[in-house]
Amino acid sequence: MRSQFDKQLAQLHRELIEMGALCEQVIALSSQALTNRDTALAEKVAPLDHEIDRKERDIENLCLRLLLQQQPVASDLRQISAALKMITDMERIGDQADDIAEILLCRAGRPLSAGDTLRDMARATIRMVSESVDAYVRQDVDLAQQVIAADDEVDGYFDRIKAHLIDRIAKGVDDGEATLDLLMIAKYYERIGDHATNIAEWVMFSVTGVHKTEAT
């Protein structure tokens, strides 16, 4: 009985790694589309987001089977409950990468010019997503803590971009619609950073049994 349960736990681990890899792909693809002003790349984001949605349902069903059909001990319950939390954040990363791509597609023929700060923010966010997935793969608490700390950097980028864009709107320098679209894209990156942080916090819970909210 335990042998079968361990096999299913190993399957859960593999499925989460695959879903995490899809999240890395989708955010990298939407960011590349933004940087290169490439609508063909933006069109490839939605199918990946749909694949992430399917993976979320598959993992959720597997977790429910583990809970209902097996007899998990405390450490098993920790892994399963953390997995259920993580897939929610992973699914939202896919959604927000798709939201970025949708803005780019709606502006076909009127490409946005992403400034250096937004490109830096995109790179920082991609790194957070990648490292949160790596932290899960390696069950690495130190790396998870680095991801959590990096969220302040992404928030700082958002604050600077927001202040810059609001100033340009006030001065009538930019097209208002384009400026609002850039602000929305920056907000999506900020949210993706939040989801990567959540994933890292659940990795820490899975390994240590203590969630950040309980440690403060």
Region spans (language model):
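Cytosolic, long alpha-helical scaffolding segments
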Residues: 1-216
